[in-house]
């Protein structure tokens, strides 16, 4: 199989095979290393999309204990206020977090999104099969605020084909922002609301 022919379903089959053998820790390590291999392929211009990007560590390690944390309406209001107050928290980060909250997509689905996937006039995001976790293409409706946030993000993207291009020159061998960028940004926001119980970006989807 050619490297560009590897799809998320192949990664899923590989990880499930390891987990089914009773080795979830090994499956987690395999996911990390496989992700790095495909990232290297992107750096060397062998491919443009990492088929591992749709998978979280919990997908490799077997079933995760279900979290019951979600943000209440009051907490969401405080979150939006904190995003405007947090030192070093950019407008791009604010728009990104609002999109994650509104669309309930996985963070890597948004981090690696390209403008060609979006029909802003038709208010649809065409998420291609090679970037979805289950290997099926998905059409995601875009509410009016999301369309406006995306139009604003486009003004920040400097004609890049990526919705969220890498922001530092040393990181541009991977052309879009990495998913690890978002938890770091969220930590700046949480510092502005220390009395609110801990929450993660994954909790945005509940």
For each feature predicted by the language model, list its residue ranges.
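A Lys/Arg-rich helix-loop hairpin that forms a DNA/phosphate-binding surface
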Residues: 1-15, 68, 201-202
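Short, basic/aromatic-rich helical patch in the C-terminal catalytic core of site-specific tyrosine
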Residues: 11, 34, 38, 110, ...
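Basic, Lys/Arg- and aromatic-enriched nucleic-acid-binding interface segment
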Residues: 18-33, 43-112, 121, 132-136, ...
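Hydrophobic recognition helices of helix-based DNA-binding modules
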Residues: 37-41, 150-153
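DNA/chromatin major-groove-contacting recognition/catalytic segments
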Residues: 51-54, 138-141, 148, 152
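Active-site/catalytic core of tyrosine-dependent DNA strand-transfer enzymes
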Residues: 72-77, 122, 131, 143-196
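A structural signal for short hydrophobic beta-strand segments in well-ordered beta-sheet cores
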Residues: 116-118
């Amino acid at each position: 199989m050619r490297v560009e022919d590897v799809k998320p379903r192949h990664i899923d089959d590989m990880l499930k095979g390891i987990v089914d053998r009773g080795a979830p820790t090994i499956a987690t390590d395999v996911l990390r290393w496989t992700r790095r291999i495909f990232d290297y392929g992107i750096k060397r211009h062998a491919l443009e999309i990492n088929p591992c990007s749709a998978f979280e560590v919990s997908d490799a390690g077997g079933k995760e204990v279900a979290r019951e944390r979600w943000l209440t309406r009051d907490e969401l209001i405080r979150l939006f206020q904190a995003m405007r107050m947090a030192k070093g928290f950019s407008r791009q980060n604010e728009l990104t977090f609002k999109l994650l909250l509104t669309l309930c997509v996985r963070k890597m689905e948004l981090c690696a999104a390209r403008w060609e996937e979006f029909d802003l006039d038709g208010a649809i995001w065409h998420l291609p099969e090679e970037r979805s976790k289950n290997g099926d293409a998905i059409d995601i409706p875009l509410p009016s605020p999301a369309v406006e946030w995306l139009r604003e993000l486009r003004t920040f993207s400097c004609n890049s084909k990526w919705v969220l291009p890498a922001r530092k020159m040393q990181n541009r061998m991977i052309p879009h922002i990495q998913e690890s960028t978002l938890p770091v940004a969220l930590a700046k926001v949480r510092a502005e609301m220390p009395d609110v119980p801990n929450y993660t970006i994954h909790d945005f989807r509940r």
